[in-house]
């Protein structure tokens, strides 16, 4: 039986879509597949624990660890890969010409090189032209982009690129 990760990967390749660690692939994950992917990650992480010679059957500290880790990665830490970009509504700018900012916004991400936590704060702002977005949308977009494995320089660029779409 083919793994769900292989099915999704094949779908991405057929579409000619890049699927690097910091890419959002939610458009190519069909309904019900995320649960299957989480189960696959759980099975694979159980193999990692077994390879580390950890007795998950008898050690109360590690029972269901693979399940918890899989859920954490798929739904939380890497949720920005699998969840659609939050909807952002822009409103007509009524003549505001200065930069408006939001911050500090807490960031939690994962280094794609070492799978170590990236924790920090950022401030973002744009100078609006014809439209403005609400301040809460800055936070949503930043969190959505941060929730995937990447190097922090690429995360910064991705946040700037996404916000620049609303500076028009």
Question: What are the functions of these language-model segments?
Answer:
Residues 1-168:
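A domain-level signal for the structural core that forms small-molecule/cofactor-binding pockets
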